[in-house]
From Swiss-Prot:
Gene3D superfamilies: MFS general substrate transporter like domains
Assigned keywords, A-Z: Glycoprotein, Membrane, Transmembrane, Transmembrane helix, Transport
TM region positions: 40-60, 107-127, 138-158, 165-185, 206-226, 248-268, 278-298, 321-341, 378-398, 413-433, 486-506
Annotated source species: Emericella nidulans (strain FGSC A4 / ATCC 38163 / CBS 112.46 / NRRL 194 / M139) (Aspergillus nidulans)
Pfam families xref list: MFS_1
Family affiliation: Belongs to the major facilitator superfamily.
Protein name stated in the entry: Efflux pump afoB
Induction statement: Expression is regulated by the asperfuranone cluster transcription factor afoA.
GO terms for cellular component: plasma membrane
Described function: Efflux pump; part of the gene cluster that mediates the biosynthesis of asperfuranone, a probable antitumor agent.
Classification via InterPro entries: MFS, MFS_dom, MFS_trans_sf
GO MF term set: transmembrane transporter activity
Application in biotechnology: Asperfuranone provides anti-proliferative activity in human non-small cell lung cancer cells.
Observed phenotype of the null mutant: Strongly diminishes production of asperfuranone.
């Protein structure tokens, strides 16, 4: 990359445009006193457990959702049970990058966000109706915004660059373990205990399960020191300046933009027709507000929540779009395969959880009430392997591209779009499912003795309480057809992962001494080291 004019005043993110800056980063890294021994072990264990809980929470919910819809008579809210979580996370994600850049990683950020996440889980466990449960999911999502960003920021702070890729892979592996075991754990509690604490027995276990591990995470973080990428003054000393630098006006624009757009998708075809003024107004209003947000971010320059200078780099926007579609593909399948097994196959939540421990789409769109066990197991294993291949590379790319002080903001961009993608896809999948189910039930009205509205309102686990015999067979066919149409959405988002992932590039970081010298135009340091881990970068 060509050098910029020396008279140009460089902003805080311009350093990633200069290869000579990487040598300064390397020198600074050698001066950092990284924790070692039991201290680094405790810190990394807490980060790994936090990632495990983050993904476990998502996976437990996917299996418990059919039982929740029956408890609250709220099948039309399925999209919001997952989407509300992603909405809370996405709305706060850009702000977390600014917070981590201003305040201590441990004392004022990671722990606070983790506590918020745990409080959201407690509220979900205590929920007595669908709106209360959705509010709990939003609060948990807000906490997860800081957890996901903080985990990556912490790894960058406690490990030298050449070790970060390896541990990031291990960390993501634990996250995938949470996705794999979550459906089984959630199914076991839903089957044998119930999904929350409103029954006489141990009904709290489903959503309280992360509290014991959460106490371990909090304890490990509380009694250890995490080195900062750059010195930070005491919180009270910089509070006024820090608040001004958080770009709260930008936050007040992105929040309503996301909420309006997702509400429009949720209301369309459910509470209001798609061509109603309410739906059109929400979607258009959300888009217009997002446009104002982009203008505001451009005007703020390097002080914005989402600095445009970072978005100029191919690796960053490629990673953002890859994760936008990647998490979407996983969550859509998690939620609707659970409905397939519990509604159509009449499996218990435990059996359903075991079935969705891996996920798949192109072949899954062929599922029917008579699909053999060998097929649905094979389909899911195939996609489970594929989805795992896309997990770690975008995060490792960002860690090796961006100077340490800017990693929180870069990660905030990636995770923001990841969560926006998940929220939009879940709400869109819910719209496709609910509208398709109503259409399919209407087509089979002569075979069904109960109104389509009553079937939709009853929830997944209550179908067999309403209909039986030939009417039940017709209802199950309608469910299967609606789920197949949701899987077509999964095919589309999976293809988009293929479209954007090549933007991560194919650079071998084993041959690069100063990893942060890698930039979007292909600049690369001299080949001097051979002992680090390879990763696709751009």
């Amino acid at each position: 990359m060509a050098e910029t004019d020396s008279s140009h005043t460089r902003g805080p993110v311009d350093s990633i445009q200069k290869n000579d800056a990487s040598s300064d980063d390397a020198e600074a890294e050698t001066k950092i006193q990284y924790p070692s021994g039991w201290r680094v072990t405790m810190i990394l264990t807490s980060v790994t457990l936090a990632y495990f809980l983050f993904f476990l929470d998502l996976a437990v919910l996917s299996t418990a959702t059919p039982a929740i819809t029956s408890q609250f008579d709220s099948l039309v809210d399925v999209g919001w049970y997952g989407g509300a979580y992603q909405l809370g996370s996405a709305a706060f994600q850009p702000l977390t990058g600014k917070i981590y850049s201003q305040f201590s990683i441990k004392q004022w950020t990671f722990l606070v966000f983790f506590i918020v996440f745990e409080l959201g889980s407690v509220l979900c466990a205590a929920a007595r109706n669908s709106p209360m449960f959705i509010v709990g999911r939003v609060i948990a999502g807000v906490g997860s915004a800081g957890m996901s960003n903080g985990a990556v920021t912490t790894i960058s702070a406690v490990l030298p660059t050449q070790k970060q890729a390896l541990f990031m892979g291990l960390n993501m592996g634990m996250g995938q373990l949470g996705l794999a075991t979550g459906p089984i754990i959630g199914g076991a509690f839903t089957t044998n205990v119930s999904w929350r604490e409103d029954a006489p027995a141990d009904d709290d276990a489903g959503f309280y399960i992360n509290l014991p591990l959460g106490a371990v995470v909090g304890g490990f973080l509380l009694f250890n020191t995490i080195p900062e990428p750059k010195p930070k003054a005491p919180p009270l000393q910089i509070l006024g300046t820090a608040i001004r630098s958080l770009d709260l006006p930008g936050f007040m624009l992105i929040c309503p933009a996301v909420v309006m757009f997702l509400l429009g998708l949720q209301f369309g075809g459910n509470e209001h027709p798609w061509d109603s003024s309410v739906v059109i107004g929400l979607i258009v209003g959300g888009g217009a507000t997002f446009g104002v947000f982009l203008v505001h971010q451009w005007w703020r320059g390097d002080e914005a929540m989402v600095p445009f200078a970072l978005l100029k780099h191919k690796v960053i926007w490629s990673a953002a779009m890859t994760m936008f579609f990647s998490l979407s593909s996983v969550l859509v399948a998690d939620f609707y395969i659970a409905i397939y097994f519990q509604a159509i196959r009449d499996d218990s939540p435990l059996m359903s959880g075991g079935a969705i421990s891996a996920v798949g789409y192109g072949l899954l769109s062929t599922l029917s009430p008579t699909t053999s066990v060998a097929k649905w197991v094979g389909y899911q294993i195939l996609y489970g392997v594929a989805s795992g291949c896309t997990t770690a590379a975008p995060y490792v790319a960002i860690q090796n591209l961006v100077p340490a002080p800017q990693i929180p903001q870069a990660m905030a961009i990636i995770i923001f779009w990841q969560n926006i993608g998940a929220a939009i896809s879940l709400i869109a999948a819910n719209a496709i499912f609910s509208n398709s189910l109503r259409d399919q039930l209407a087509q089979r009205a002569s075979q069904i003795t109960v109104s389509p509205g009553a079937i939709v309102a009853a929830g997944v686990r209550s179908i067999r309480d309403l209909v039986s015999g030939s009417a039940l067979a017709a209802v199950l066919e309608a469910y299967a057809e609606a789920i197949d149409r949701v899987m077509y959405l999964g095919i589309a988002v999976s293809v988009m992962v293929i479209v954007f992932s090549p933007g991560l590039g194919w650079k071998d970081i084993r041959k690069t001494k100063d990893l942060q010298a890698l930039t979007s135009d292909g600049a690369q340091g001299e080949a001097t080291e051979k002992e680090t881990v390879p990763v696709a970068l751009g």
